[in-house]
Amino acid sequence: MIRAGIIGATGYTGLELVRLLKNHPEAKITYLSSRTYAGKKLEEIFPSTLENSILSEFDPEKVSKNCDVLFTALPAGASYDLVRELKGVKIIDLGADFRFDDPGVYREWYGKELSGYENIKRVYGLPELHREEIKNAQVVGNPGCYPTSVILALAPALKHNLVDPETILVDAKSGVSGAGRKEKVDYLFSEVNESLRPYNVAKHRHVPEMEQELGKISGKKVNVVFTPHLVPMTRGILSTIYVKTDKSLEEIHEAYLEFYKNEPFVHVLPMGIYPSTKWCYGSNHVFIGMQMEERTNTLILMSAIDNLVKGASGQAVQNMNIMFGLDETKGLEFTPIYP
């Protein structure tokens, strides 16, 4: 049985980890940490968790003694120093601190210096692309929600040189849970309801993460123009991607079917069928659709994920499974909630 701990257990991704791990047949929760609610039982704060473990302040000695794996569900910049204190525990960080190959890129976009970063062996935790590296990883940087939806939608096309990587346009829409549980006027019901708005235009922190991984896949420099939008729903991301091509839709579709034929969570839809966030709600599944705009030789790719599951906690559990030699679908086999 894998002994699992969670730091940041009372945020949305932390709570989702609790839900998934409580139902995992090969894992048990042995440590929960929260600065805000330390000393209280989790179910006192969130009755829906049915989890009576007492939340505590972060204690590296307790983690090392009681955990085989630690999930850090903290904002960017909060995990790095904590993780460096731990010995003998596998780390899966749901923040951005271990996603980048170049610490200079992290410094540029996140405004923090990561001392000694080059000495930490880490793997970017997108199983569909880095499964073999994840198997032997000690530290995994779990991908961001938007990058997960965009990278999986583009990977086959870039891998097989089916599209032009120089200018990739991404229009993405996310449910409000993607912003976390922080108190902010912008996320009040009366501000979000019956409204749709872009945010962090031309400066979203997930852009360099996308460009890093897409560049590895294509072997060329990749430029991503990314505009995210906040939509009045709780969960889900729908990314619509525009990229130039001189190939036929049939050829591209066949390449996607072949690329993902053995992937349990990625589903390439029949031509003419387009994904909906409703289809992956509460699950680790990804749905990808496509269409060709023949007048302009533009391939339009569409992907739908649940931002809290495949976009965060579900993918983290998938990584845990791989790191401990389990079937990666273990504890994640459930179908989406519908309607």
From Swiss-Prot:
Transmembrane regions listed in the UniProt entry: none
SMART domains: Semialdhyde_dh (SM00859)
Entry keyword set: Amino-acid biosynthesis, Arginine biosynthesis, Cytoplasm, NADP, Oxidoreductase
Cellular-component GO terms for this entry: cytoplasm
InterPro entries reported for this sequence: AGPR_AS, AGPR_type-1, NAD(P)-bd_dom_sf, NAGSA_dehydrogenase, Semialdehyde_DH_NAD-bd
Coiled coil: none
Catalytic activity, EC: 1.2.1.38
UniProt keyword annotation of Cell division present: no
Family matches, as Gene3D superfamilies: Dihydrodipicolinate Reductase, domain 2, NAD(P)-binding Rossmann-like Domain
Official protein name in the record: N-acetyl-gamma-glutamyl-phosphate reductase
Organism: Thermotoga maritima (strain ATCC 43589 / DSM 3109 / JCM 10099 / NBRC 100826 / MSB8)
Encoding gene (name): argC
